[in-house]
Amino acid sequence: MKLPVFALSLIAAFSCLADEPKLEPLFNGKDLAGFKTEGSTEFWRVENGVLIGENNAAKKGNYLWTEKEYGDFVIEFDVRWKGTTPRGVDTGIEMRKPNIQLQLGISGSLKVDMSGSWYTGKPLGYPEAGQAKEAKTLMKPEGEWNTFRIQAKGNTFTCWINGQKASEYTDAKFSGAAPLGLQIHPGVEMKCEYRNMRLAPL
């Protein structure tokens, strides 16, 4: 028996939904439960359901880490930021061992916006294969909310910005499970806000 085209479309749609990982809240919108920080907590606070990291030019940097470790996962969140100096905002999301970072804002070393690009540390820094060269066309202006989706699966790291694929990078070196870290870069006057943080292990 042949199925109508409409029925086949429904089956395909439900199949896609079944394959979609179930994202659960990573941040409760009330406090820093489930996270830990190195040293002082003065860099981090929660206001009106928003997780805020803030620094000034005189302060050292800081990381806010998840208490749990993650290997293969997908995470979605809304983020907006504002820098009050010419250097702008320099932050990112750390993951895996040894740490690989998804850059948010201006790279301190390159002095250009590398949002959505993968930073692997020295000697490569931002390998060309992992750069989000079209990120500026995908993102809303500074100060507005942008939705990021990050997936770490096997040796491949993928980033989507506002629903559009921005970068993909493959590197077998970053294989160990580790906490996720939100960065506040040292010596930069900046504010970065997160909301609707949801994650699913894969």
Regions from the language model: what does each represent?
Residues 5-15:
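Bacterial N-terminal signal peptides
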Residues 16-202:
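Carbohydrate-interacting regions of secretory-pathway proteins
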